[in-house]
A protein has these predicted regions:
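Acidic/His- and Gly-rich active-site-bordering loop/insert found
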Residues: 1-99, 117-124
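Acidic/histidine-rich catalytic neighborhood of metal-dependent amide-processing enzymes
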Residues: 102-169
Length: 169
């Protein structure tokens, strides 16, 4: 039995995205969102990778927000398995760096949007993703910087307001 959320989560775990390195996670997610019709904008700042992806033109905006970075592994010999090799235990638990915080949540958000848009190709509102590789570190060049930029744009256009935000942590 295949599970789209598990498969995407495993793909993200395999990427050694130790803060602030994204290790290509945003490229993986961005490619899937682009296939759905999202408009992608990279808003990188220094060594931090940020992605702002939007779908739809009118109506209230629901934003999915999260991060691709993980904290450093520490002493690798203290691990019972490679932290960047996803492993499903005999009890069905997924192990790997980012499995709980928060690569599985990102995968669930992406797959939920895929299913939603498959059944609702023209929703009555807008969808967005605000993703960063700067949450586990200083957390100043990620979400904070993107929200500040979006606020500036909103002051000029009024069209980028986030009405609702879902954070999967």
């Amino acid at each position: 039995m295949s599970c789209a959320v598990l498969e995407l989560t495993e793909e993200l775990i395999r990427r050694e995205s130790v803060t602030p390195d994204d290790a290509g996670c945003l490229d993986v997610i961005g490619a899937r969102l682009q296939q759905l019709g999202f408009t992608l904008e990279r808003m990188d700042r220094g060594s931090v990778s940020n992605l702002w992806a939007t779908f739809g033109e009118d109506g209230p905006m629901v934003c999915f927000a999260g991060h691709t970075d993980v904290v450093p592994t520490g002493d690798i010999t203290a691990w019972t398995s490679d932290p960047f090799v996803p492993t499903v235990t005999e009890h069905g638990h997924l192990r790997g760096r980012g499995a709980a915080d928060m690569k599985s949540s990102l995968a669930a958000m992406v797959v939920a949007c895929e299913e939603f848009l498959k059944n609702n190709p023209n929703p009555p509102g807008r969808l967005s993703f605000l993703l960063t590789s700067d949450e586990e570190g200083p957390a100043t060049d990620g979400t904070v910087a993107v929200v500040e930029e979006l606020a500036k744009r909103q002051a000029h256009t009024g069209s980028l307001a986030i009405d609702y935000c879902i954070v999967g942590e």
